[in-house]
């Protein structure tokens, strides 16, 4: 693009960079309306992991509601990956491998690699078992497609017409697009991402968000509770394992840190995969499928040797702390005081240690059941009488306010004592949740 055209475009476009965490808040509405969203931002900032994680959460909640609970989900063999297609535009062949098909007004061409995913969507929508359910097509690296393919995909979204002439029900299909910015976009002039210009059709046929790199949004999203299917049951847990959240809250510089001695890096993608591994270990132990424990070799496999060793050391340290059940007791009484040796240990902990322990306590299966009012009282007392970092208030505030139905943290939110207790700092939780981006980092 010439300098003159770029200057004219700058005058026409006023780009506001949003934090990815802010966009996550509005995703349920787009999931409901099936309006396309397009998220543009630099690579490595967590777009794909955050969007896909939230997408899986929305799908799981919808299936639980439509099918009537986890018993039916298990009976019907629920697998969230059967409910969406993930298409990586960067993996599309560079040569013109295309298939012509008839659209309303013209003959379009579509990459051959896309056809199986579109057929998968059609089969899903035709299956009576899936009546009332949404199918999602997530196209990552959308700007890796040339402009001709971008137009073709937009025509598909607009018309719902598949290459074989059949149509898909647009009211039951939701498109998510994510891509890297072209240098012609104001605010991204220095971008060196390999990308094509974004078609105007993409911008006008959906809500286009431009996002800025923001590790704090990634950590905040990671601390939010969602419902996840283990293959056996639904559990409420963090989007990112509390081990990693606490370690990264303590050492944010480890996130996306380049190591000249190792090609591996701890970014949003590897953090999510490492989190899945850590939860997988917990699931196997809970299902009594062996005496499993996390291994530092796996952490290094995702994050690299140097950063992996630092993470493993922090996780090992967190493992040595008092457990949530030691801090909260057996739930038979609400007695708790500063004279209690366990409470003294908690009070002496660093901020990131308290962060881990309280987040872990609100997960399903932690041994601290917040449908029991004695546990609720103790949490309220801890938040009101002990030294708790502001990050914990912010993370718990978001966690409580956005808790899915049927989870441990939702039990906490619904508890009348928690909402009324003067010690709970309930209003403070809400206030900090709304102002979460202003909280200080844990020293």
Mark where each language-model region is.
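Cationic, low-complexity basic patches in intrinsically disordered or flexible, solvent-exposed regions
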Residues: 6
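C-terminal regulatory/interaction module of P-loop NTP-utilizing enzymes
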Residues: 9-86, 90-137, 142-443
